[in-house]
Amino acid sequence: MGAYLIRRLLLVIPTLWAIITINFFIVQIAPGGPVDQAIAAIEFGNAGVLPGAGGEGVRASHAQTGVGNISDSNYRGGRGLDPEVIAEITHRYGFDKPIHERYFKMLWDYIRFDFGDSLFRSASVLTLIKDSLPVSITLGLWSTLIIYLVSIPLGIRKAVYNGSRFDVWSSAFIIIGYAIPAFLFAILLIVFFAGGSYFDLFPLRGLVSANFDSLPWYQKITDYLWHITLPVLATVIGGFAALTMLTKNSFLDEVRKQYVVTARAKGVSEKNILWKHVFRNAMLLVIAGFPATFISMFFTGSLLIEVMFSLNGLGLLGYEATVSRDYPVMFGTLYIFTLIGLLLNIVSDISYTLVDPRIDFEGR
């Protein structure tokens, strides 16, 4: 197991490098970067001071149209601006350096977990990630916990009544829930229960109320649960299928084994066979899959659900950074997402070997 873990940990480095490198060069050839957006903001008069790296800015008063001819500029939005202004904007965002120099600087900074500062926010990228990460982790943990609390009893019941009408109908509903994307459930929940068209039972935005700090501790708990209900429901509704069917199939596999036949021949009751023998063995792989389920909820649920419910998590942070072309934040969130996913996959493999020593990854 030690050699396998070393190999997996060493594979994290080239995987991170490949993902960051591919996205870096894709972004370089994509139109509409931060310089283009800054130029557009100046031309349309949307900002008096445009924030740049280090919190400084470019004065719009220096960018009166009709000064100079910059038809040779690489930025299509800057045709009426002074070339010196465009050069200043380009310098502030670091795009005056060659692409290879920016690339290697980014790699060196990321090795040291130095993601720089946001282009459009007065904070470092690491600070923004630290503030946003707990929200995404909380959403993922709640979703995973509820999925386990529902899927395990449901899977056991489906195994006990295998082939019955309950099994058939529950399978149909599970498949339908699995096929419908989480964001569609989120829209339905908002329309029906968040003041859309019918009931106004739950808040639409945020994780806590505006007066959260002034509430007593018990009301803080209630307020938090009140806000998290709809986002968690939207995340978990489509997440029951895989774990429920895994639980059912694990039970059915155990029931067919020889030790169950022997226990029945000895006169052991079906209840004791189910809960004292089959349950313990069937739950090994189900429990070991907790990290993998959390990864699924963390990645698939964080982006769209956080955007739709305005939860200040890592998914919403990455989405807003992508829309505004805030490259340091965008690449920083991508780096953290990838690193967490790779490490949790390793934890998942370790948990499998802990609950079932027969699983051997050394032969891989």
From Swiss-Prot:
Signal peptide (residue range): none
In this entry, the parts of the chain located on the Periplasmic side of the membrane are 1-8, 59-135, 194-224, 306-326
Q: Where in the cell is it found?
A: Cell inner membrane
Q: Which gene encodes it?
A: yejB
**Out of the domains of life, which is the source?**
Bacteria
Signal: present as a keyword of the record? no
Provide the taxonomic classification: Bacteria, Pseudomonadati, Pseudomonadota, Gammaproteobacteria, Enterobacterales
UniProt source species: Escherichia coli (strain K12)
The record's function comment reads: Probably part of a binding-protein-dependent transport system. Probably responsible for the translocation of the substrate across the membrane.
**Which keywords appear in this protein's UniProt record, sorted alphabetically?**
Cell inner membrane, Cell membrane, Membrane, Transmembrane, Transmembrane helix, Transport
Which residue ranges run through the membrane?
A: 9-29, 38-58, 136-156, 173-193, 225-245, 285-305, 327-347
Looking at the record, the residues that make up the ABC transmembrane type-1 domain are: 133-348
InterPro entries reported in the protein's UniProt record = MetI-like (IPR000515), MetI-like_sf (IPR035906)
Protein name from the UniProt record = Inner membrane ABC transporter permease protein YejB
Q: List GO molecular-function terms, semicolon-separated.
A: transmembrane transporter activity
Q: How does it sit in the membrane?
A: Multi-pass membrane protein
Q: What is its main location?
A: membrane
A Pfam entry, by short name: BPD_transp_1
Similarity section:
Belongs to the binding-protein-dependent transport system permease family. OppBC subfamily.
Q: Output the CDD domains linked to this UniProt entry.
A: TM_PBP2
Which regions of this chain are Cytoplasmic-facing, per the record's topological domains?
Answer: 30-37, 157-172, 246-284, 348-364
Q: Which PROSITE patterns match?
A: ABC_TM1 (PS50928)
GO BP terms: namely: microcin transport; oligopeptide transmembrane transport; peptide transport
A GO cellular component annotation here is:
plasma membrane
